[in-house]
Swiss-Prot record:
Pfam (any one): cobW
Protein name listed in UniProt: Urease accessory protein UreG
UniProt key word Nucleotide-binding: yes
Organism: Methylobacterium sp. (strain 4-46)
Keywords: Chaperone, Cytoplasm, GTP-binding, Nickel insertion, Nucleotide-binding
Single GO MF annotation: GTP binding
Biological-process GO terms, alphabetical: urea catabolic process
Domain of life from the UniProt record: Bacteria
Binding site for GTP: 15-22
Summary of the function given for this chain in its UniProt record: Facilitates the functional incorporation of the urease nickel metallocenter. This process requires GTP hydrolysis, probably effectuated by UreG.
Similarity comment: Belongs to the SIMIBI class G3E GTPase family. UreG subfamily.
A Gene Ontology term for the protein's cellular component: cytoplasm
Oligomeric form and interacting partners: Homodimer. UreD, UreF and UreG form a complex that acts as a GTP-hydrolysis-dependent molecular chaperone, activating the urease apoprotein by helping to assemble the nickel containing metallocenter of UreC. The UreE protein probably delivers the nickel.
Length: 204
């Protein structure tokens, strides 16, 4: 976690395309909306599809969900030049002055994507079992340095021949004691554990 700042806790959610970032956003919104004043910001390159999906799912009222069209590399919009997302955060804070929490979903990217500390106080990184049991040992800052690693789609392990015990051992080795959680977000499994981490690690 980066040095605390004045204002709502900003949680960055990153990970490759299809890993389950939007499903995690939806689950966290539904788990936390009754306890905290929150909003969600999503990033897509050319559309606002993830924002639309959250709205349709009823994750939050429509006015509390903002879609950002990055128009280019999704990594740049959360790291090297986060200005478009910082502007979105500022706008949400203007609309809702009492915010406790802002969830920020990056566009799908590779294992090297990380959030700028200017943008996110706490980072969650989502990978999925369908990518194969080798994913944790490939490393990259999302896997090794995120505040919480979320290993999603555990229900698919038997179908893709992935050994969860191997994935867990590799995760422990690559993360050096940093926390991780196995989830099956489609089933709702593990959402509460992630929500609890956000509350405790974020000091909510």
């Amino acid at each position: 976690m980066t040095t605390p700042h004045h204002g709502p806790l900003r949680v960055g959610i990153g990970g490759p395309v299809g890993s389950g970032k939007t499903a995690l956003m939806e689950g966290l919104c539904k788990a936390l909306r009754g306890r905290f004043d929150l909003c969600a910001i999503t990033n897509d390159i050319y559309t606002k599809e993830d924002a639309r999906l959250l709205t349709v799912a009823g994750a939050l009222p429509e006015e509390r969900i903002m879609g950002v069209e990055t128009g280019g590399c999704p990594h740049t919009a959360i790291r090297e030049d986060a200005s478009i997302n910082l502007a979105a955060v500022a706008e949400m804070r203007r609309r809702f002055p009492s915010l406790d929490l802002i969830l920020i979903e990056s566009g799908g990217d590779n294992l090297a994507a990380t959030f700028s500390p200017e943008l996110a106080d706490l980072t969650l990184y989502v990978i999925d079992v369908a990518g194969g049991e080798k994913i944790p040992r490939k490393g990259g800052p999302g896997i090794t340095r995120s505040d919480l690693l979320v290993i999603n789609k555990t229900d698919l392990a038997p179908l893709v021949g992935a050994d969860l015990a191997v994935m867990e051992a590799d995760t422990q080795r690559m993360r050096g004691g940093r926390p991780y959680v196995f989830t099956s977000l489609r089933r709702g499994d593990g959402v509460e554990a992630v929500a609890r981490f956000v509350i405790e690690a974020g000091g909510l």
